[in-house]
């Protein structure tokens, strides 16, 4: 990653997100701390269950394992610093720390977007082509899709971070956010950023809209197949599908509000509330929706904890 432009005269940023709330910052600290611990416990539990349950050593649960790992890292990049700033009068962050946070935040965020699209395709094959599932989604393809998601996500993050680091910052240094995100940092640049903003907008479309459309296509076929199943199993699958789509719409919808709009309408106070949705809420919901509601995961969790597991009588 290149350093900031040599003409930069600002040596640090001040993150002013939530500063106007005064004494309510202590309450926010408690709320975010509890949410963060819940996210960590849920995701670490999922990773441990998948790791120590040989029955879950399949591509589908491999995707869930990596998503849980990525979600844990994703929140680790943002929330610990936010917790410190909520209790401190000093809310500064150096250029290098800001660039590092931006890079890893974008890297894990992009990886998550791509992984969820991969998981949508995995569900499409499992439900629409069950007899061919193991032939299509084998372990080799699973590893390739995971590697491709991570490599693509961090490559996009590297390009985006370098584009922002090349901008000139020579005046205001108050970032109207609780972490270093693209829009509020770009707003502080004192040179024309139109061309670079266009490039960043193109990257945002690539990592948000393309996976979102692929997910909609996958789940369109899934819903069509499920509706043809006239049983309780079909209704249960439909409810599961609906819960997945709800989280998808919340995640990609909020991300679109922030990243797919003109600069003139960016970096407002409302953005901080929207950002909480995809930096805290969806990482909290994903383990519940994709894993902890899954029967096989719950059964494996009981076995890991040494709890009795009900078995069907023949």
From Swiss-Prot:
GO terms for cellular component: membrane; plasma membrane. One of its GO terms (molecular function) is odorant binding. Residues 1-26, 77-100, 162-198, 259-271 are extracellular. Disulfide bonds join 98-190. GO terms for biological process: detection of chemical stimulus involved in sensory perception of smell. Keywords: Cell membrane, Disulfide bond, G-protein coupled receptor, Glycoprotein, Membrane, Olfaction, Receptor, Sensory transduction, Transducer, Transmembrane, Transmembrane helix. Residues 48-55, 122-140, 219-237, 293-314 are cytoplasmic. It comes from the Eukaryota. It holds the Pfam family 7tm_4. This is Olfactory receptor 10T2. It comes from Homo sapiens.
